[in-house]
Curated annotation (Swiss-Prot):
This is tRNA (guanine-N(7)-)-methyltransferase. Disulfide bonds: none annotated. Belongs to the class I-like SAM-binding methyltransferase superfamily. TrmB family. One of its GO terms (molecular function) is tRNA (guanine(46)-N7)-methyltransferase activity. It comes from Prochlorococcus marinus (strain MIT 9215). It catalyses: guanosine(46) in tRNA + S-adenosyl-L-methionine = N(7)-methylguanosine(46) in tRNA + S-adenosyl-L-homocysteine.
Length: 209
């Protein structure tokens, strides 16, 4: 069971220092993939192992999970993976993150908290203001991948991203993964659970234009 954390809590107003790319990674020149809401980070650990030609950054709002993930990175001496604790909206909207955002080539939102009650929609990670921040900072060609097993949440995320002029939908059938990064080659724990239980998965790809 996922532990729900209120991202609007004042506890997340203070942002930890974001290291430079050279501090986070062995080779700061590699393309950078960002996973928002990375949980324990197993998805990124697997990606970092499968595709070593990229750097990976995970943002997670549960501090204990981030501490454990950082310890694993240290123990395994992984040079292309880093984790940051906090609210992604606050972190990426902070001035110290601007340079990092401009180096991001793709972002994934995998099975984010649905926050089913309407009064809690404002707690969802994808908000119009957040998408505006991304549209203003991301380079052209940057990809966004969303994936969920909750149809209502998918529709909400799709409307929110699609309403921003700077992002266009890409038909998955026409998307050439050989020419771009493919985070879908690795499945999250939630996705494996959904597949085993034959639950529908809703996903979409967007590009910054």
């Amino acid at each position: 069971m996922r532990q729900h954390v209120n991202p609007l809590s004042s506890n997340f107003n203070k942002i930890e220092r974001i290291p430079s790319l050279s501090e986070m990674f062995g080779d700061s020149k590699l393309n950078l993939h960002l996973d928002i809401g990375c949980a324990a980070g197993e998805f990124l650990f697997n990606l970092a192992s499968v595709n070593t030609s990229w750097n990976y950054l995970g943002i997670e709002i549960r501090e204990k999970l981030v501490k454990n993930a950082k310890l694993k990175v240290f123990e395994r001496e992984i040079k292309n993976l880093y984790f940051v604790f906090g609210n992604a909206n606050n972190i990426l909207n902070d001035v110290q993150s601007k340079y990092i955002i401009r180096n991001i080539k793709s972002i994934s939102f995998n099975f984010p908290d649905p926050w089913f009650k309407k009064r809690h929609y404002k707690r969802r990670v994808i908000q119009p203001e957040f998408i505006n921040v991304l549209s203003n900072q991301l380079q052209k060609g940057t990809l966004i991948f969303i994936k969920t097993d909750v149809k209502e949440l998918f529709d909400y995320m799709d409307r929110t991203i699609s309403s921003n002029f700077y992002f266009k939908k890409i038909d998955k059938k026409d998307f050439n993964y050989s020419e771009s990064f493919n985070p879908n080659k690795v499945k999250t724990n939630r996705e494996n659970y959904v597949i085993v239980n034959q639950i529908n998965i809703f996903e979409r790809i967007y590009m910054r234009i």
